[in-house]
């Protein structure tokens, strides 16, 4: 049961402040904003709004170009830095994404969203030590947030630090006991540790929480193949 926590988190953090639209409506909106931006070339707001729509259409290069325009005039614009880094990630230009996240942290130290994104990006780049250091920093600075523990747990699990990962998933659950994803990650970790009985108990808990058994079928199979 594979999950892409990097993409899921980044998509969740994007606030476009627009209603759900069809692709045609989005393209029409972009055309309108492009004309307005041509008429008001100094308007940062118009360029950021257009770039946000470009991201929704997965037009990474167009979005990046708009953020470049903003950052040429305002090098420390937090929105442009964060979402240009996101666009760079989608374009697989990881070093450039990393540089933008790091610059943003210089200007907004300890920013939660940026720490999460940078920790996960480093893990994606196989910079495991740096990823774990950032995850530790994330937990130390945001120990009230369940996602901080879940991010660190994911990094620990990938490195085979299963007992630490299990502890962190339990911490995440203690801070947000309605998030079924955290329970599922915990189950996967228990299976990795060959603690099948405990994994089955957690699966039973998930079904009681309303998760359809069909969605958990693969995990049940893994427990039974012990």
List where the protein language model places each region:
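Structural marker of alpha-solenoid helical repeat scaffolds
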Residues: 39, 73-74, 107-108, 141, ...
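Helix-start (N-cap) detector for alpha-helical repeat units in TPR-like alpha-solenoids
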Residues: 44-45, 78-79, 112-113, 146-147, ...
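N-terminal leader/linker segments that initiate helical-solenoid repeat arrays
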Residues: 17-61, 65
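Terminal, low-structured helical/coil segments at or just beyond the last alpha-helical repeat
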Residues: 24-28, 188, 192-226
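Register position in tetratricopeptide repeats
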Residues: 56, 90-91, 124-125, 158-159, ...
């Amino acid at each position: 049961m594979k999950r892409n926590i990097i993409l899921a988190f980044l998509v969740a953090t994007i606030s476009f402040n627009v209603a759900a639209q069809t692709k045609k409506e989005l393209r029409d909106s972009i055309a309108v904003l492009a004309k307005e931006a041509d008429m008001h070339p100094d308007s940062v707001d118009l360029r950021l709004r257009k770039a946000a729509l470009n991201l929704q259409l997965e037009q990474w290069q167009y979005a990046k170009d708009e953020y470049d325009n903003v950052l040429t005039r305002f090098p420390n614009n937090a929105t442009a830095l964060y979402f240009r880094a996101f666009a760079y990630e989608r374009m697989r230009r990881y070093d450039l994404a990393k540089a933008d996240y790091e610059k943003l942290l210089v200007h907004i130290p300890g920013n939660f969203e940026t720490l999460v994104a940078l920790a996960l990006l480093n893990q994606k780049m196989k910079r495991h030590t740096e990823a774990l250091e950032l995850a530790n920093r994330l937990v130390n600075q945001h120990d009230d947030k369940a996602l901080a523990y879940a991010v660190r747990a994911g990094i620990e699990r990938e490195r085979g630090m299963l007992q630490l990962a299990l502890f962190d998933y339990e911490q995440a659950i203690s801070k947000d006991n309605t998030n079924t994803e955290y329970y599922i990650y915990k189950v996967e970790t228990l299976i990795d540790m060959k603690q099948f009985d405990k994994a089955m108990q957690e699966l039973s808990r998930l079904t009681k929480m309303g998760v359809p058994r069909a969605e958990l079928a693969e995990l049940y199979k893994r427990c039974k193949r012990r």
